[in-house]
Amino acid sequence: YLVDVVSRYVEWVPICPEVEAGMGTPRDTVQLAQFGSDIRILTKEGIDHTEVIDGYAQKRVKALERAKLSGYIMKSRSPSCGMDRVPVFQTDGSTSRNGRGIFAKRLMEAFPHRPGEEEIRMHNPRLRENFISRVFACYRWLQVVSTGLTRDSLMSYHRAYKYLLMAHSQEGTRRLGRLLANPDHYATTQELADAYLREFTNVMKRTPSRRNHTNVLQHMAGYVSDQLDSNTRRELTRMIQKYREELLPLIVPVVMLLSLIHI
């Protein structure tokens, strides 16, 4: 799916930290190992590659910042790229699963508000859809930033995403609205934008529920209902209800709404 479908809309930047750091192929298997509070990346024979991988990671992350990265997908459980639950070997021979890959750690620290997921979670359609939505939202945010942040541009961005945000969290959407309604609480537009982005990111991380999607569909239907004849209005209501009952996918009422909006 990511290669055959998503590639039509994004430019992938393939990265293998071990290869790019000079470890070559084929290479010895590496793993995370903990020594006190220090986590290292070692081969099974004990050769330490931590400084090499970490030094590479810091340089690569700076290059990705210049490339305006809009999101990233990482390899799960990888000692370099795993975002969470990476096995960490202890000195007593036990293994914990609370590690984070060396490269992933640097990337996530540098881009705390950029969408990221592990490839294994992309098999879940809801998580995949949520991630892709966040990538496009991030791309558009970077466009807003590149043209110069203003209160008006923040308001325009929020209006464009209002209903998608409502599907993720109605309370979160209200918080964002209140934030933009009180810009004088912030010393500069940049501080306002930073606060907005933090909250926007938190809201978008929440997977939309069917109930919230239904509420948004009904809300949007209200804008066009007065322009519809009774049969079309009933059909739209029926489509939304069938989605709510899990008898139709979301795309069906969405496409119908779009067709009615453009009549």
Task: State what each model feature region is.
Residues K44-K59, S94-A160:
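Divalent-metal-activated hydrolytic enzyme cores
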Residues Y56-Q90:
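N-terminal glycine-rich phosphate/adenylate-binding segment common to multiple enzyme folds
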Residues M122, S133, R151-M155, R159-A195:
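Conserved catalytic alpha/beta core of Sir2/sirtuin-type deacylases, generalized to analogous enzyme cores
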Residues R175-Q241, P249, P253-M256:
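Long, compositionally biased charged/polar accessory segments in the mid-to-C-terminal portions
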